[in-house]
Design a protein with these regions (language model features):
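Histidine/cysteine-enriched polar flanking segments
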Residues: 1-261
């Protein structure tokens, strides 16, 4: 493990205690070299409370002292007023992510930096686009996450990634490539996507909650006051088996099927 087994286990336990997930990030085109300090982004993705913060730590072990449940209280932290995109480029987990993700990250970084207002930002907060370690969903590479909301997109090629970014800046979600939102369980994410697609809810804040009412039924609460019940079941796709990762054999595809009740 890049951090060593002991530190990696400690960080994982610390993040689990705060109901958080840890990702490595680096700026596109960099080799991930240690420059003497480490930039840290902390995203609060709970619907209605989304926020994004940045800070710098001297050592990776300093993560263990960060109260990531209350990032606004961390000394020296900066609240960001713009979205951030993460592109999975984790080639060790799946070479497809590196082959497809790195070019997308580089192009999107150029696009995003040109879509800012031109104001100078502190070094720790200037980057809008980052390469990241394994995000899951590698069979949908290139995979993209938009923070602070935690919206995840699949098959986000260069043109699609630019569209997703521009919509996020305007407070919108791209529905065609949307796979879910990190604040909810996997079937809960399928329920939200189904409701958004059915009623064309493209606003970032159009869905305010997803509640599990029974084992397979979810209540999707919308900002307009409406609520929709959705049954979600996991099943094997009707599509032919396909490789789960680059260079691997075919594997049957499991999918969540969502039905509005």
């Amino acid at each position: 493990h890049a951090l060593g087994e002991e530190l990696a286990s400690q960080i994982k336990a610390h993040m689990n205690a705060h109901n958080a997930r840890f990702q490595f990030i680096r700026e596109p085109g960099s080799g991930g070299q240690d420059s003497g300090g480490h930039r840290v982004l902390i995203a609060e993705s709970t619907p209605g409370h989304e926020a994004l913060y940045a800070t710098t730590i001297g050592s990776v072990s300093d993560l263990l002292s960060l109260d990531v449940s209350h990032p606004e209280t961390i000394p020296g932290v900066t609240a960001l007023d713009f979205p951030v995109a993460l592109i999975c480029t984790h080639g060790k987990r799946d070479v497809c992510c590196a082959l497809k993700g790195r070019p997308v990250a580089a192009l999107l970084s150029q696009h995003a930096s040109g879509s800012t207002d031109g104001a100078d930002a502190p070094e720790t907060t200037s980057a809008r686009v980052w390469e990241t370690s394994h995000t899951g969903g590698h069979r949908f590479a290139p995979a993209m996450i938009v923070l602070p909301w935690g919206f995840t997109y699949g098959r986000a090629g260069a043109q699609a990634a630019r569209q997703i970014w521009d919509l996020a800046v305007d407070g919108q979600v791209e529905l065609d490539m949307l796979r879910g939102r990190s604040a909810f369980s996997k079937p809960g994410q399928a329920a939200e996507v189904a409701v958004r697609s059915r009623f064309h809810l493209t606003g970032l804040a159009d869905v305010v909650a997803v509640e599990n009412t029974t084992e397979s039924v979810f209540r999707v609460v919308c900002a307009d006051g409406n609520a929709h019940s959705v049954e979600v079941v996991q099943t094997v796709s009707d599509l032919p088996a396909r490789p789960a990762t680059c260079g691997k054999g075919d594997k049957e595809v499991k999918v969540f099927r969502a039905t509005l009740l």
